[in-house]
């Protein structure tokens, strides 16, 4: 989980160095994120609040831990299948935003568990 957070941070640093910036959600064409691994990652991201609710209800932080491991797995599959760098500009921006949202959820989930989210490994 920490490695995937660091990997996303590295990706963002590299693309920022090439003149790209993480776009605002309003500047992304979400319809371009229609591939199987992209939609699986989006679905997994959408479950974060529910997992937080379950963890609070059950007084069981392992809900968050399991969720983060599953999210990291979804991101790994996405990153393996979907190119970000070198894609058409609109696709690059959409995938970069998806990666950044994943980074944010990983960071917040790790913080809830009292674990640092490294930007480099």
What are these language model-derived features?
Residues 1-121:
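Non-catalytic interaction-recognition regions
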């Amino acid at each position: 989980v920490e490695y995937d957070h660091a990997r996303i941070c590295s990706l963002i640093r590299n693309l920022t160095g090439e003149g790209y910036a993480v776009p605002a959600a309003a500047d992304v064409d979400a319809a371009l994120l229609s591939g199987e691994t992209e939609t699986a990652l989006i679905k997994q991201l959408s479950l974060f609040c529910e997992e937080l609710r379950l963890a609070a209800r059950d007084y069981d932080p392992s809900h968050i831990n399991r969720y983060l491991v599953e999210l990291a797995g979804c991101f790994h599959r996405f990153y393996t299948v979907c190119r970000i760098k070198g894609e058409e500009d609109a696709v690059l921006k959409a995938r970069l935003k998806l990666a950044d949202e994943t980074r944010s959820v990983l960071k917040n989930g790790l913080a809830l568990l009292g674990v640092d989210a490294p930007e480099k490994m």
